[in-house]
Amino acid sequence: MKRSFYVLTLLIIASMMSCTPKKKPQAPDAEKKPKELVNHDHKRVDNYYWMRLSDEQKNADTPDEQTQEVLDYLNAENDYTASMLDHTEKLQEELFEEMKGRIKENDETVPYLDNGYYYFSRYLEGKEYPLYYRKKGTLAAEEELLLDVNKIAEGKDYCSVTGLSISPDNNILAYGTDFVSRRRYTIRFMDLNTGEMLPDAIENTTGRVTWAADSKTCFYTGKNFETLRAEKIMRHDLGTESEDDVQVYFEKDEEFTCNIGKTKSEKFLVIFSSQTLTTEARILEADNPDGDFRVFVPREVKHEYSIDHINDKFFIRTNSDDAVNFKLMVTPENDYDRDNWEVFIPHRDDVLLQGYTLFNDYLVASERINALNNIRVFNLNTGEDHYVDFDEEVYSSRISVNEVADSDALRYTYTSLTTPRSVFDYNMKSREKELLKETEVLGDFSKDNYQAKRLWATADDGTEIPVSLVYRKGFERNGKSPMLLYAYGSYGYSRDPSFNSSVLSLLDRGFTYAIAHIRGGSEMGRQWYEDGKLLNKMNTFTDFNDCAEFLIEENYTNPDKLFAMGGSAGGLLMGAVVNLQPELYKGVVAAVPFVDVVTTMLDPSIPLTTFEWDEWGDPREEEYYHYMLSYSPYDQVKKQNYPNILVTTGFWDSQVQYWEPAKWVAKLRDMKADDNMLLLKTNMKAGHGGASGRFERLRTTALEYAFMLDLAGK
């Protein structure tokens, strides 16, 4: 009887414990260490400046006191995030397996022909990285394994392989590797006849080489070790030490970077120096690698141009003579003075000439019209031109790999919010299309289950902003459905509507997914970019909030169900919009966000700073300082309510240093007036692009989606 009493007592205690509410995890409280920053007689106090570590501190075998304090804080934030989202772990795993399950594990790319070989890559089941192959002469030939990135990645927490390039004699493979995610690549070389690695190794590069015609000489871009600026072009002879490499060009202007490539004709090597507003090209015959590069057109402030060559002619895409949306010129190779340039495609106010590719008998232009990509084909022999037809209202098309000049076939890709990425060959003579591959989406996916459309939101100044959105059919426009609104809006980069199989996990749970094509991109032409940069940058942020208000007013969602997402410069967007109108959003995901704008742009030692003064402004000038300060998310944190916020970053990020989001979260937590979630997730092994494996990166997506789905009650 006594024993029964004890058992009953234990059961009652256990029951009481199970009914006790789980104690809410304690959020980290970052220590304040005020640092006074004074510019233009204006004082700022940064309480979290101490979170900034140097590369030397991060790479040290034994952490010093400051490093340990930073690591402890980041790990505490990671633990807090895990605790706050532990109830979503099952959902996260479900989402991960769901997204992974849509990906065909054994898959390969469509082969393309280059210099007598067909090249393609393949993924194998269970493998995170691709394998690269080629076949000689015909697709029926025996395949030759060039590189297995999975083997290179063995034992590495992070692995990026880039810039695969084959010598003109088809015997040597060059490629770049980065095992830290700082984008300092080491170039290696492989003898394809023996499969053996050559002893040549070139460190601190962009990871790509351009071959001279002799297959023994190559050129590459070297980086500044501290700022990572691509600042010099070097010449390397196979079989020699990299210390003996010859510098053929050094870019003295710290606001410029440089790179090297080759024309379509393969006759010329081309060095490009560029910044946001100005470019300059230098050329040298590829069969004379020891020669001196000569300037094509001397740089002029705000003159942007690029060149290519075929059939003894240079083609020049240029914005000279107020061609804001660019025009295409042509000139003989033996006399390319600007006086000899002739118009091939004139400038148009409503069409942005984005680029072009050359064939012996054709020129294919990429044109952006009314926020959509268009492909235009010119017959160089007859002068006739036509556009490739596309059926959907909202789509994205891009010129793909076209290495063979003597061809009637154009390779391009096509995708939309409902159509997976598709690869086509287009016969430019007969105008017939051949679908070579549509990316297979496993499971029960059918594009017929989804609806995409284009809307136009009106900004506060009357500008019409395009919005692309997609939802599962059966969606009711009653204002009750959750929505994810995404945007970028910087650098003139256009966020085109493309298929993302991961988004299906939101759509199938009742979400609508929308993209706001805000100013700062180039969706509506080059002026669209100009109107969202420098002293017009505020337009980017107000455009996004105006799009959010429009979608709410049109009953696509409501503020308690609206989520926003952006990364990098899009993370800056997220920080700015929640400072301006936090009441519009239930939750925000800011990935690797650039949020400490003024402090970063005042420091030329930080990677990308000098190169980006033409994007944001140079805060050493007082006008820009105060304007940038007016929107910098870190500087504009207020004592107000904020939505639920999830912030992600990478400890080794070279583009947006980890301390920016870390400081931002610490300041938000100290000042915000609400009890909403504020979470920081730092990948301690990755950089700006996150995890390097094709499946592992889905875990971050699963975390972000679980965060939103949980808040949406899904």
Positions of predicted regions on the chain:
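A flexible loop/linker signature enriched in serine peptidases of the S9 family
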Residues: 123-130, 153-158, 177-186, 201-204, ...
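Beta-propeller blade signature
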Residues: 133-136, 188-191, 232-240, 283-286, ...
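Blade-edge beta-strand/turn elements of extracellular beta-propeller
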Residues: 191-203, 240-252, 287-297, 336-346, ...
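C-terminal motif of bacterial Sec signal peptides marking the signal peptidase cleavage site
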Residues: 15-18
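Non-catalytic accessory segments flanking enzyme active sites
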Residues: 68-165, 176, 256-309, 343, ...
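Hydrophobic beta-strand positions that form the internal "hydrophobic ladder"
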Residues: 118, 173-174, 218, 269, ...
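Active-site-proximal cap/loop segments of hydrolase catalytic domains
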Residues: 515-714
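Cap/lid segment of the alpha/beta-hydrolase catalytic domain
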Residues: 150-164, 175-182, 196-198, 224, ...
